């Protein structure tokens, strides 16, 4: 019997294991030289001015919003078609999330929809680079500049993504994730990249108790006057155990993303005969990181609902995922915004299915998934 094929699995090898062992043997396992290495490498590779490692992208989003002064009475525009953590952070800061619709085929936010949602209370715009593709930053930056509203890019899916001739994170402010299923991982972790000196300084303070320096700096500098609380902050620093994994993964990113791209090309060929609807690619020049490979399962076309198809895949030993259930359709937000209607988001939320995609997949795994989908859809279309 074939083993279960998960929808994701981290590409952890001997280099990462040895890096962790070296940290454990070094005597310094919390925030230290590996964090510094990760931040330095990230800036060198992607051209960012500042890189601040944190314990998760959610933590990075929280303190970035806080650093921008977001609070009660403010509004933040963002899509509902995203992971719920962004909107949770807006609400927990006492601000109001203004959820907008996305393009039906790419899941990217529409610049016109964002501009239409701007009010005098709008204090930030958070677009999402979805599944590894970038949103249209030129249009969004023009809106940001025209209205004087900060743009914070949710780049959790976009490590190694390019928009036109720029890396995501090279310009502006972007927040990355190193969660277990991301293109590079350290189990849990994230990073804030920004070209804003003042914002970078405040994010760095807020991630570690509001101190002007982190633990590693304090050891080097002793009990210097600067090692004092400048403002109340959080404990969102990343340990060197985690950072060491991320340093190795970042070095391996080109091979990791190249393998993802090859697997997706195989998927497109293998699934071409099926009535599944993969996401469309943005029309502008870009480099896709292929964090996720998603299809839309429309019952009228496929003879089976998304949820039924996912259950059938599971019965056949194949994992799948849902990225994501629209935020405004979930209990807390559904009750808070009962009249919010986002047609494209809702259509996709009911049909999205993420198929297995990770660097260590075999070519035969793609064939296995395609054969399973062919069997499932074939049997249901016949019986309908």
Curated annotation (Swiss-Prot):
One of its GO terms (molecular function) is UDP-4-amino-4-deoxy-L-arabinose aminotransferase. It holds the Pfam family DegT_DnrJ_EryC1. It catalyses: UDP-4-amino-4-deoxy-beta-L-arabinose + 2-oxoglutarate = UDP-beta-L-threo-pentopyranos-4-ulose + L-glutamate. Its EC number is 2.6.1.87. Keywords: Aminotransferase, Antibiotic resistance, Lipid A biosynthesis, Lipid biosynthesis, Lipid metabolism, Lipopolysaccharide biosynthesis, Pyridoxal phosphate, Transferase. Pathway: Nucleotide-sugar biosynthesis; UDP-4-deoxy-4-formamido-beta-L-arabinose biosynthesis; UDP-4-deoxy-4-formamido-beta-L-arabinose from UDP-alpha-D-glucuronate: step 2/3; Bacterial outer membrane biogenesis; lipopolysaccharide biosynthesis. One of its GO terms (biological process) is lipopolysaccharide biosynthetic process. It comes from the Bacteria. It is an enzyme of class 2 (transferase). The modification N6-(pyridoxal phosphate)lysine is found at residue 182. Its cofactor is pyridoxal 5'-phosphate. Disulfide bonds: none annotated. One of its GO terms (cellular component) is membrane. Catalyzes the conversion of UDP-4-keto-arabinose (UDP-Ara4O) to UDP-4-amino-4-deoxy-L-arabinose (UDP-L-Ara4N). The modified arabinose is attached to lipid A and is required for resistance to polymyxin and cationic antimicrobial peptides. Belongs to the DegT/DnrJ/EryC1 family. ArnB subfamily. Homodimer. This is UDP-4-amino-4-deoxy-L-arabinose--oxoglutarate aminotransferase. It comes from Yersinia pestis.
């Amino acid at each position: 019997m074939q083993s279960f094929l998960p929808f994701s699995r981290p590409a952890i090898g001997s280099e990462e294991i040895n890096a962790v062992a070296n940290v454990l043997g070094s005597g310094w396992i919390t925030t230290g030289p590996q964090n510094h290495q990760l931040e330095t490498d990230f800036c060198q590779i992607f051209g960012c001015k500042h890189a601040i490692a944190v314990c998760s992208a959610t933590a990075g989003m929280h303190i970035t919003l806080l650093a921008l002064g977001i609070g009660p009475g403010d509004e933040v525009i963002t899509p509902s078609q995203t992971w719920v953590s962004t909107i949770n952070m807006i609400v927990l800061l006492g601000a109001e999330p203004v959820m907008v619709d996305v393009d039906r085929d790419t899941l990217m936010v529409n610049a016109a929809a964002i501009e239409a949602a701007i009010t005098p209370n709008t204090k930030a715009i958070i677009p999402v680079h979805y599944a590894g593709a970038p949103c249209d930053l030129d249009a969004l930056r023009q809106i940001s500049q025209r209205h004087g509203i900060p743009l914070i890019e949710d780049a959790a899916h976009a490590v190694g993504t390019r928009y036109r001739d720029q890396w995501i994170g090279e310009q502006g402010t972007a927040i990355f994730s190193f969660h277990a299923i991301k293109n590079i991982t350290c189990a849990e972790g994230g990073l804030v990249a920004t070209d804003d000196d003042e914002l970078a300084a405040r994010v760095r303070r807020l991630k570690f108790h509001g101190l002007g320096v982190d633990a590693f700096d304090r050891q080097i500098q002793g009990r210097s006057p600067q090692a004092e609380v400048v403002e109340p902050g959080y404990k969102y620093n990343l340990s060197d155990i985690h950072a060491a994994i991320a340093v190795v993964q970042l070095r391996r990113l080109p091979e990791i993303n190249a393998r993802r791209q090859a697997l997706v090309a195989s998927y497109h060929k293998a699934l071409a005969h099926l009535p599944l609807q993969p996401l469309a690619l943005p029309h502008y020049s870009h480099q896709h990181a292929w964090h996720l490979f998603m299809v839309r399962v429309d019952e009228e076309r496929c003879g089976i609902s998304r949820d039924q198809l996912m259950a059938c895949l599971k019965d056949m030993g194949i994992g799948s995922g849902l990225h994501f259930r629209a935020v405004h359709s979930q209990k807390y937000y559904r009750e808070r915004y009962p009249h919010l209607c986002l047609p494209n988001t809702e259509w996709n939320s009911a049909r999205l299915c993420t198929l297995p995609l990770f660097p260590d997949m075999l070519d035969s795994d793609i064939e296995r998934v395609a054969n399973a989908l062919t069997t499932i859809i074939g049997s249901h279309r016949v019986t309908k």
